[in-house]
From Swiss-Prot:
Positions of post-translational FMN phosphoryl threonine modification: T187
Oligomer and partners: The complex is composed of six subunits: RsxA, RsxB, RsxC, RsxD, RsxE and RsxG.
Name under which the protein is recorded: Ion-translocating oxidoreductase complex subunit D
Family: Belongs to the NqrB/RnfD family.
Subcellular localization: Cell inner membrane
Pfam families found in the cross-reference section: NQR2_RnfD_RnfE (PF03116)
Length: 352
């Protein structure tokens, strides 16, 4: 019998990868339910398309690499990648976009590096950024939440729009995006950025229907709170650690508060930053990816804080309304450096 001598640390975790991934999938249920409630059945269709695409793409690559397909697919990582991408894109985006983004995420951003545990970047966010850069119009065509929408597509209409671009009655995305004020709606972050650049005051912007929510943007505040609830459950289950979400949210809130105090006429308030866009999804479900995040506790705090700073900078001064995906990928780049300088010193050895 040949024994393999592995390098330290010699740790043991009874939880398998598949179970951790399953817990994350279960924790996503409140967020998915909220998106279905406010944005319609399109989200469910996108999740199904992304899940099937992710499994097929992973199976194809594993077959080509002559690895066990069944054993690898059981780790649920491909399903999670597909789900995270599906809930990040507009619910009525064309079917081929979610398929393209998912296949790119699984094959290029994950399997090309060697598979789970080898990829330096979050695969779902790679797929998202590729779609955002390639198809910016489609990727920013979000429907207004149901509470301010004029035309609410049903399940059949959602399928029709995703696969053909039109509802059963002949309506298109321009019709479906109309709000109660007769104007095509965008996300709270997109609306704020566009309106500020157009010279509108913050007082005027806050009167728009998209900001009719109690805390932040209509619908979006509840979606973010739902993702927050799922994230808290993950913490309770010890599936993730608190360092990254806390440092990310605290840094984002601190930067947003300081910016808002110094320039209230051009920068969004803290509650808009915290409860709009993909803030809570990013904090608890994307940044906490154990493969692409820092591995030390101090490193996790730095990693989360860096991502929070980058999100605020991109949202406030960048060309894109929501900066979570870009912030995640930029923070991923720094992980080796962060881990190098925050790794615990071995007893009896000098630091360095």
């Amino acid at each position: 019998m040949v024994f393999r001598i592995a390098s330290s640390p010699y740790t043991h975790n009874q939880r398998q990868t598949s179970r951790i991934m399953l817990l994350v999938l279960l924790a996503a249920v409140p967020g998915i339910a909220a998106q279905l409630w406010f944005f319609g059945w399109g989200t469910l269709v996108q999740i199904l398309l992304a899940s099937v695409s992710a499994l097929l793409a992973e199976a194809l690559v594993l077959k080509l690499r002559k690895q066990s397909v069944a054993a690898t697919l059981k780790d649920n990582s491909a399903l999670l990648t597909g789900l995270l991408l599906a809930v990040s894109i507009p619910p009525l985006a064309p079917w081929w976009m979610v398929v393209l983004g998912t296949v790119f995420a699984v094959i290029i951003a994950k399997q090309l590096y060697g598979g789970l545990g080898q990829n330096p970047f979050n695969p779902a966010m790679i797929g998202y950024v590729v779609l955002l850069i390639s198809f910016p119009v489609q990727m920013t065509s979000w429907l207004p939440p149901h509470e301010i929408a004029v035309n609410i597509p049903g399940f059949i209409d959602a399928i029709q729009v995703i696969f053909s671009g039109h509802t059963t009655s002949g309506g298109d995305m321009n019709t479906l995006r109309l709000g109660i004020d007769g104007i095509s709606q965008a996300t709270p972050l997109d609306t704020f950025k566009t309106s500020v650049r157009a010279g509108h005051s913050v007082e005027q912007i806050m009167q728009y229907p998209i900001y009719s929510g109690i805390l932040a943007g209509a619908g979006w505040q509840w979606v973010n709170l739902a993702w927050l609830a799922g994230g808290v459950w993950l913490l309770w289950q010890k599936a993730i650690r608190w360092h990254i979400p806390l440092s990310f949210l605290v840094t984002l809130a601190l930067c947003a508060t300081l910016g808002w105090l110094f320039s209230p006429e051009t920068l969004a308030s803290p509650q808009i930053h915290l409860l709009s866009g993909a803030t809570m999804l990013g904090a608890f479900f994307i940044l906490t990816d154990p493969v692409t995040a820092s591995t030390t506790n101090r490193g996790r705090l730095i990693f989360g804080a860096l991502a929070g700073l980058l999100v605020w900078l991109i949202r406030s001064f960048g060309g894109y309304p929501d900066g979570v995906a870009f912030a995640v990928l930029l923070a991923n780049i720094t992980v080796p450096l962060i881990d190098y300088y925050t790794r615990p010193r071995v007893y009896g050895h000098r630091k360095g």
